[in-house]
Amino acid sequence: RRLPWKHRELLSPARLGTTAHQNLAWGSRSVLNKLSEDTLDVSAVLAQLGRQTRQAFAEQQVEGVSEVLRQVQQISNDLGVQVGELKALLDVNGISLSNGAISLHNNDNTPLRQLGTGSSRLLISGLQKAAARSKVIIVDEAEYGLEPYRITRLLNELGSKETNPTQQVFITTHSPYVLRELQANQLHVIRKPSAVELAFNPDNAGHKVYSLDGGEIQQATLRACAESFFCKRVIVCEGKTEIGLVRGIDLNRQDNNAATVVANGIHCADGGGDSMFARAKVFSSLGYPTAIFKDSDKAPQHEVHTQEAIQSGIAIYEWGDNRATEDAIFVSCPPELIPALLDIAIERKGVDSLESHIRANSNNSIGFSDCYQHFIEGYRPILAKSANKKSWFKDIEPAEKIARHIVGPNYDQFTDALKGPINQLF
């Protein structure tokens, strides 16, 4: 209560909300006042305009007023109220002309308040930065009304790239584009204690802030996996094949009205191959319950990283037995569904390519037609090796199709080589 007004202004945050058109006119709370408070004095001009408006109205003949004046004059005379000659003039106190009546217009005299939402917010952010009175700015839904390329411009204007910022900016967002444009040390995750934590430590009722220090791997994770920062839990998948498998199984569960990982707030992040361990640690350090879903074809090389992740509380789900994801698929697939897998490979690579891949990995002993029409158990490792080395399914779309339309509907027929880790994951 005892703070001087100038000190209150320094503490009071400026808010850039979804509607901010009032800042494009000289209203009482407009940012334009902060740009012009020492130079703009239009009181005399507005008073003169009020008098001119009153005089101009008096010179106009307003239809219907004369009859009303005659009736009022008659009634006042009958009652003995002395009013003299009646006139209908503008009451100077009824003409509301203030600084708020002055607004910005463009070259064709269109008020700038009619700009689109995104354009007006972008302009106002620049005005607020120029005014620089408030050291705190609150931005609600930074992406609202803006194309992605203009989001970058807005964040730059707010100081996202400045090494020595002069203002503190609090941003709420639901856009991965916004996160990708931030520096890693600008991202902070605020969490409230869980019911279990409160039960064991009632005094720990405050929120906890998790932050990043801006390291290279953190910045890379923020840009590569921005969508995952909006979820409740994260599955860091080694690559796109694993992402596709999880998504495909999840879609099949959705098709059958079963619980899905998406409904539980879980998102699959791209681990980027061997970077998956470092990326998982980034999410875990921010308080996200984190798991890694990987294949096992590099188990010896990953052993140290795997143990470190487990000790950090990160769950590990993998096929085991040094199997790649393609191994797990072909080893566990029932024979009658092998052609369906090959059909998906044909869509991506073509029959001729599959023929050469299979012959190259079988010492030219078998070809595509042998596997497609006369499949035997001994062909499984050849198909798995061909699929792995020649990337038959190494993308989200083919792996998702396999999981949704082949594995999911025939789940009970697949062996535990595939089902075991998936059961644990789901």
Where are these regions (language model features)?
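Extended helical coiled-coil dimerization/tether regions that scaffold
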Residues: 31-123, 127-136, 160
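Acidic, Mg2+-coordinating catalytic modules of nucleic-acid enzymes
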Residues: 223-236, 240-426
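Short glycine-/polar-rich loops that comprise or flank the Walker A/P-loop
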Residues: 9-13, 133-134, 183-186, 263-264, ...
